[in-house]
Amino acid sequence: MADTTFDIDDTERRMRGALQSLKQEFAGLRTGRATASLLEPIVVEAYGQSMPINQVGTIGVPEPRMLTVQVWDKGMISAVEKAIRSSGLGLNPNVDGMLIRLPIPELNQERRAELTKIAAKYTEQARIAVRNVRRDAMDELKRLEKDSHMSQDDHKSWSEKVQKLTDKVIGEIDAALAHKEADIMQV
């Protein structure tokens, strides 16, 4: 019996996608230092549709504790300002002509704890996504065995490989959380 009908690479790709998605979510969590990626999750209502902030202006980091957004269309300034205020990042935009300045305030202990909880929530969502991919892979393996496309031994072997992969990716997710928590709590 051939076991080539199961694609563990696809399973790994999907699990790694959950990890990448988590890292993008983490990039949007403020740590007290200015980074352009902090504004990436912000969506602006522009021209009748939702657009990422980097499609309506240029994001700059002129100082370690300052971000700027150079808006390309004067009519978009209020929409960009509104999107930043409603983003939940705790930023207070200052409009200066076509430039929006965003001073990055020092994080207080309460906000650090709140950001840590948000990071933990994102991490749990990533773990769930990985477990869902694992479940899909296990269901596929059961189906292949049931349809006689795979022997019991091959099924057991592939199941163990999927479980090892799951454990590895969840370990990487947990390591990413530990790194982000340390970053947030650093004064």
From Swiss-Prot:
Keywords: Cytoplasm, Protein biosynthesis
Gene Ontology MF terms: ribosomal large subunit binding
Pfam families named in the record: RRF (PF01765)
Domain of life: Bacteria
Compartment(s): Cytoplasm
Major localisation: cytoplasm
InterPro entries: Ribosome_recyc_fac, Ribosome_recyc_fac_dom, RRF_sf
Signal peptide annotation: none
GO biological process, one term: cytoplasmic translational termination
This protein's record includes keyword Membrane: no
GO cellular component: cytosol
Family from the record: Belongs to the RRF family.
Functional summary from the UniProt entry: Responsible for the release of ribosomes from messenger RNA at the termination of protein biosynthesis. May increase the efficiency of translation by recycling ribosomes from one round of translation to another.
Protein name listed in UniProt: Ribosome-recycling factor
Originating organism: Parvibaculum lavamentivorans (strain DS-1 / DSM 13023 / NCIMB 13966)
Lineage: Bacteria, Pseudomonadati, Pseudomonadota, Alphaproteobacteria, Hyphomicrobiales
